[in-house]
Regions:
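Cross-family detector of peptidyl-prolyl cis-trans isomerase
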Residues: 2-178
Length: 178
């Protein structure tokens, strides 16, 4: 049985940062988001239980509140280097069900390449959450969201090795840490 959860996420992927929040909607999502799934399905998945996941870093930027059709503002720590491990900081704890490996989620998120003021992707800017199966996205999203609760608001930094790498096969995919 597949679980269906809604995740509102401003997310840092591989070389970008963001926030993620989850809320349950009780509906199943039949389709995965094209961008997150495209790279994740072509490579061997990382075993999340063997991955070192940090819960905070002094290098993480400050992220403001998103608004209607606008990504949140981001303020980078001057001269800070990107964390080398997947880093998942809980900004606000939720009280819903835990996100499982077979969950479908709907996420509101913004993604930035590390140290960039410009988003490479943002569901806030599109005006609607992105729906995807947790097993169909990059390892950084999958391992970063796994076990978090519906209602959580997260800031996630994803190193390139858990995303699209330093030289993505898809020229539209972001390279490095986000």
């Amino acid at each position: 049985m597949r679980r269906s959860l809604t995740a509102a996420a401003a997310l840092l992927l591989a070389a970008s940062l963001g926030l993620a929040g989850c809320s349950g909607d009780g509906k199943k999502s039949a389709k995965a988001a094209a961008t997150p799934a495209s790279a994740a399905t072509k490579q061997e998945k990382v075993d999340c239980s063997k991955l070192k996941i940090d819960t905070d870093s002094k290098a993480l930027p400050t992220i403001g509140q998103p608004s209607s059709n606008k990504a949140p503002a981001i303020t980078w720590v001057k001269g800070a280097k990107a964390p080398t491990n997947l880093t998942v900081k809980t900004i606000k704890a939720g009280s819903g069900a835990a996100v499982a490996a077979d969950s479908n989620v709907a996420a509101n998120y913004s993604g930035w390449k590390w140290d960039s003021a410009t988003t490479f992707d943002s569901s806030f800017e599109r005006g609607s959450a992105t729906r995807f199966g947790l097993n169909g996205v990059i390892d950084g999203w999958r391992c970063g969201l796994l076990g978090h609760k519906v209602g959580d608001v997260l800031e996630i930094s994803i190193p390139g090795k858990l995303a699209y790498g330093d030289k993505p096969a898809n020229p539209q995919a972001p390279a490095g840490t986000f």
